[in-house]
Regions:
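C-terminal functional module detector
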Residues: 6-9, 72-75, 87-90, 105-115, ...
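Substrate-binding clefts and substrate-entry loops adjacent to catalytic sites
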Residues: 128-130, 218
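Short, contiguous clusters of charged residues that form electrostatic/catalytic patches at enzyme active sites
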Residues: 84, 144-148, 249-252
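Long, charge-dense tracts
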Residues: 121-123
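Short connector loops/turns at beta-strand edges and beta->alpha or beta->beta junctions
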Residues: 125-126, 208
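Short loop/hinge segments at the start of secondary-structure elements
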Residues: 142-153, 170
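An N-terminally biased module of ancient metal coordination in phosphate/nucleic-acid-related enzymes
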Residues: 1-103, 111-113, 128, 135-138, ...
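Histidine-centered divalent-metal-coordination microenvironment in nucleic-acid enzymes
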Residues: 117-119
Length: 452
């Protein structure tokens, strides 16, 4: 999180760095340093930092109360030390063609407990990354201001940036609303700006699944998958699912907005990520280490499991980002994100390919990848106008299980469309499945008895 940015670790080990503070400031620094150290050493860090979360209130009213952050020289030094250390680690471990690292951070605007967080990814190297300091929600809580800063830095440095919305399921309906965080209706300018900077969204992670909810997909038997009925705030508040929280609803809202303003602001590729805060890639169910590093210590697990609110053990073992890149390099992976040739899994390393086109036929399955690229577009692409025979588009789809995990149940296509009145709809189609099951009269498929 750019708002604290590893500064807590720097303070824990090296103290708050300030030049010549007066007596009162010195006492405050000493108190804060020791309070932080005591909380971490006693294992009560999560409880200590919970009081920093916002209180529950109307997000659009809360965001109006934002004021520019005051000058805090000691904290600024600690944060810059952390950024220097992080960029060095990323650069030292980047091995093009073998293992790719990125310079990035999280922008964590949470007005009134509404999660508007974005993950910022760049293709910067260490030298370029240290020429700027990450933009945080303390600089501005509005996504548009973040995008403006990214555009400015891109022009100054030549660095490519991506802004990836995440945990939209706890955004209190604002992440994919038809109005902006400032309360203005989405217009053409905003739609184009958002499309430019946010081609991809994170739809599954440790704090639940953001694809859809049974309130908005009542005919989908999988819409109850991995809910997270909590908000990121001080105090409790009953969870209320809102249309603007979920990605599948956002895709439909984008189609509706395109009819109104001429641009679809929510034409999104989808990825998963862990957000585990442990530094461990443990997204698989049998290899789950919890949300925080404290959860990874065996003797702490029973206490965490009994907590009333969200904890590392009320969360999901999820997820992974899969990217169809030409090579394992920063440039190639960023290119794949830009064209949305990405997908999400909840942890298993399932391999999925999808191509769409107007002239694809069943015979193209013989060389799915070559024919898919030659005669169609890959996942995340736009089909364009009908260039083939009468009828709709065709799709080539291939899914292969992770050899270390369960068998696959089925492949589905979820269709979203806008009718003549401008209203959107969705329909779920089962197109391939394991075993000798058959579709019923409503196109439904019985649950698989065993996926192992």
């Amino acid at each position: 999180h750019a708002e604290f940015f590893g500064g807590i670790r720097d303070i824990y080990y090296d103290g708050i760095q300030a030049e010549d503070p007066n007596l009162i400031e010195s006492l405050l620094y000493w108190f804060n340093e020791n309070e932080i150290r005591d909380a971490i050493d006693s294992g009560t860090g999560p409880e200590y930092f919970a009081h920093l979360l916002p209180v529950s209130e109307d997000p659009r009213e809360a965001i109006k109360n934002w004021t520019e952050r005051p000058e805090t020289p000691g904290a600024e030094i600690s944060f810059r030390n952390a950024w220097q250390e992080l960029t060095e680690a990323a650069e030292n471990h980047n091995a093009p063609g073998i293992f790719t690292t990125f310079m990035g951070w999280e922008w964590s605007s949470t007005p009134g407990g509404a999660n508007l967080h974005r993950i910022i990814v760049s293709d910067a190297d260490k030298q370029t990354a240290t020429s700027f300091f990450p933009f945080s929600s303390l600089d501005s809580p509005y996504p548009e201001d973040l995008w403006q800063w990214l555009a400015k830095k891109e022009a100054e440095t030549g660095v490519r940036f991506l802004s990836i919305p995440h945990n939209s399921n706890v955004s209190k309906g604002i992440m994919f609303d038809v109005t902006t965080a400032r309360g203005n209706p989405i217009d053409t300018h905003y739609a184009k700006l958002r499309t430019r900077w946010e081609p991809v969204v994170e739809m599954t992670q440790i704090k639940g699944d953001s694809e859809t909810h049974e309130a908005f997909s009542p005919e989908d038997e999988f819409a109850r998958f991995e809910p997270f009925p909590f908000y990121l705030q001080n105090g409790t508040e009953p969870y209320v699912p809102r249309k603007g929280d979920y990605v599948r609803a956002a895709l439909r809202t984008g189609l509706e907005l395109e009819q109104q303003v001429g641009t679809n602001p929510f034409q999104l590729g989808m990825i998963g990520s862990t957000d585990s805060h442990t530094g461990l890639s443990t997204a698989e169910e049998p290899n789950f280490w919890g949300k925080f590093s404290r959860d990874s210590v065996p003797e702490n697990k029973s206490d965490s499991a009994l907590a009333d609110g969200p904890s590392g053990w009320t969360m999901s073992a999820s997820g992974l980002a899969a990217v169809w890149a030409g090579e394992n390099t920063r440039d190639s992976i960023m290119d794949a994100f830009d064209r949305r040739e990405v997908y999400a899994t909840t942890g298993p390393r399932i391999q999925v390919r999808l191509f769409g086109g107007w002239q694809l036929t069943e015979s193209d399955l013989a060389d799915l990848t070559a024919n898919g690229y030659a005669k169609g577009v890959p996942m995340g692409g736009s089909l364009g106008s009908n260039e083939g025979p009468e009828g709709g588009p065709a799709f080539l789809i291939q899914a292969m299980r992770d050899p270390m995990t369960a068998n696959l149940d089925r492949i589905q296509i979820i269709k979203g469309w806008v009718d003549k009145t401008g209203s959107s709809h969705e329909s779920v189609f089962n197109i391939a499945w394991a075993g000798d099951r058959t579709l019923d009269a409503n196109g439904k498929l019985a649950a698989i008895s065993d996926t192992v």
